């Protein structure tokens, strides 16, 4: 009775549920971008569009990392390469695990469907769920008020196979309708597929290299990888300090600033605050994306980031133009024009991703 009071659209045959008031959700790419920008803010350098092609290893130590943009001579290498972690381990002469890719497809529903549910739910106990490879996905009310449905879990030999198949979407909806019968594919506004990077042991590998001493592996990370990321980072930082301290003094940065100023979100402001922003910068008053109410000013803020990715998708993941019902049908040409003007290049040179 309490469950249906909180979530009236849940299956009326539900017999019990577990309430966890400490659970929640974040925007995964927004969080990652925030961490990256804060790292740069504190002195880190990020090399985008840079692929590791090989390594030189001598006497149990990586002496050089060769990339498509030159050669690095690192004191320490952290292998967090996802589905390619075993390749990096092989280059470093420290491979003791294998990655078997596992594809997962999720659907994003229109914001109007967000009113159907306000929590995180995953059905347990059915034959359909017992055959899954992991927790089995679920229904999530996102921080942007959409519903996310999925993912599924399908073994694949292709590490970059992010294709989306109709049968995956159908399977996910069939399973999650057990929880919420009101779910309908008609509310889907987009869908996507990611590839997990599990090991055959189905466990995280967070440890120092076994043969190569200036190496830390952070591999085999899958769900709940996002949840554990802050704790994993603390462990890896401790390992890194321990390894580096053998050759040099290591001290905490006394000027470290853990606060990263974010981009103002005008659609979440009250009228008075929004008017004040527009008065200071008229670009905040020019709405580019009607679905998400994203202004020209917010797009320019994204392009001025210290981790700037001046592409349509780069801007999309920072301030959300193109993430609404029309999926960029209206605003994409304007976003391309703003990027081109910012970079001082022709429209034809602006990339999608």
What are these regions (language model features)?
Residues 34, 134, 143-144, 155-287, ...:
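C-terminal catalytic lobe of FAD-dependent flavoproteins
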Residues 48-50, 189-190:
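Short loop/edge segments at beta-strand edges and connector loops
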Residues 160, 295-306, 329-347:
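Iron-sulfur (Fe-S) cluster-binding segments and ferredoxin-like electron-carrier domains
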């Amino acid at each position: 009775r309490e469950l249906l009071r909180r979530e009236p659209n849940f299956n009326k045959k539900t017999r019990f549920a577990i309430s966890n008031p400490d659970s929640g959700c974040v925007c995964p790419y927004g969080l990652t971008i925030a961490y990256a920008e804060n790292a740069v803010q504190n002195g880190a350098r990020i090399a985008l569009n840079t692929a590791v092609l090989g390594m030189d290893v001598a006497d149990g130590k990586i002496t050089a990392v060769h990339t498509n943009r030159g050669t690095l001579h690192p004191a320490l290498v952290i292998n967090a390469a996802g589905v390619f972690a075993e390749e990096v381990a092989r280059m470093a002469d420290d491979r003791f695990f294998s990655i078997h890719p596992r594809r997962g497809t999720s659907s994003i529903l229109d914001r109007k469907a967000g009113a159907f549910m306000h929590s995180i739910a995953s059905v347990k106990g059915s034959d359909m769920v017992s055959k899954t490879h992991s927790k089995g996905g679920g229904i999530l009310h996102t921080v942007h008020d959409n519903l996310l449905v999925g993912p599924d879990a399908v073994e694949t030999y292709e590490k970059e196979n992010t294709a989306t198949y109709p049968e995956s979407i159908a399977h996910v909806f069939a399973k999650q309708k057990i929880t919420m019968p009101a779910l309908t594919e008609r509310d889907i506004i987009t869908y996507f597929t990611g590839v997990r990077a599990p090991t055959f042991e189905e466990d995280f590998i967070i440890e120092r290299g076994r043969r190569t001493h200036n190496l830390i592996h952070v591999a085999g990370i899958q769900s709940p990888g996002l949840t554990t990321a802050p704790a994993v980072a603390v462990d890896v930082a401790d390992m890194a300090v321990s390894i580096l301290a053998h050759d040099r003094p290591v001290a905490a940065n006394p000027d470290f600033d853990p606060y990263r100023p974010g981009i103002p979100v005008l659609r979440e402001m009250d009228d008075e605050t929004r008017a004040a922003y527009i008065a200071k910068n008229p670009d905040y008053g020019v709405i580019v994306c009607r679905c998400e109410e994203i202004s020209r000013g917010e797009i320019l803020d994204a392009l001025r980031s210290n981790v700037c990715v001046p592409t349509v998708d780069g801007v999309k993941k920072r301030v959300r133009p193109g993430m609404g019902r029309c999926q960029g049908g209206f605003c994409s040409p304007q976003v391309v024009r703003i990027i081109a003007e910012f970079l001082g290049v022709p429209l034809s040179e602006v990339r999608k991703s």
